[in-house]
Amino acid sequence: MAFGEVHIPFWEESEHIRRTCSVTGLYFWTRDKNRKTSGDTHEDPYTFIGSPIIDGFPMRGKELKDSMRSSFLDYFSENSHSKVDPYPVIARWRDDIHLTIASIADFQPHVTSGRVPPPANPLCISQPCIRLTDVAAVGRSGRHLTTFEMMAHHAFNRPNDGEIVYWIDQCVRFCDDMLVNTFGINPIEITYVENPWSGGGNAGAALEVIVGGLELATLVFMNLEEHEDGDIIIKGLTYREMDLQIIDTGYGLERFCWAAAGTPTIYEAIYPESVSWLKE
């Protein structure tokens, strides 16, 4: 499934245009008719440092994270999603990973395969995650963490059975509406970059949501499963279409906090006491 083949009415209604990034060659959607890059390249600086792009969050540290998390979950709760408690960070229901690395990992493989129903449908969650693959980048990039929370909204569709909760168009509408009307982000600053996603045996078309040079979220439209007889190749692996169509999103809690704080790095926004202690 390619975005060029999928009709998304929201793009037309909101006057988005599809462009090709002059740096990466990836397609992206924007309201800015003069934009030439996707927003996530070496030519795109962080524009929010010293000038926050999310308003209304003057606090720092735990208070900031708690407030940001509540705003996200409340938005989706008010839009017919059930709040689900986070899963453990030790992925004891998985035999392929030890740690919970994303919110969708909570539901792989049992729910995503269709063998087990989801705890709610649609649902929203803020899942603590641990990613040791990012250790080398911590402290160098100013944005990487090994422990973080992935805020998310998920929906599990069974189109063959006529069970559709919502799919691509509504997912993008939720994301854009929340960014603009809940967090006060200037809509012309938002870009949606087309870049397929894969992980945990599943894959699908995806949109990376970029604001101010920072990737705030990824919207994945999961409709593929890894299979040796598959005829779709993504990142060197073969996939085939599966019965479920799954909305798999991930919004970085700490990155939202950083965009709201406008501090030099993400660490001053979420660990102000630790940074102050280290500076002493």
List each model region and its residues.
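Residue-level marker of regulatory loop/turn positions in helix-turn-helix DNA-binding domains and
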Residues: E13, T30
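Cysteine-rich micro-motifs
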Residues: R31-I49
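Short glycine-aromatic motifs
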Residues: H16, Y46-F48, S80-S82
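Structured aminoacyl-transfer and RNA-binding surfaces used for tRNA recognition/handling
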Residues: P52-E280
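Residues immediately within or flanking Cys/His clusters that coordinate Zn2+
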Residues: R18-R19, G25, D32-T37
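Short, intrinsically disordered terminal segments enriched in charged and Pro/Gly residues
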Residues: M1-E12
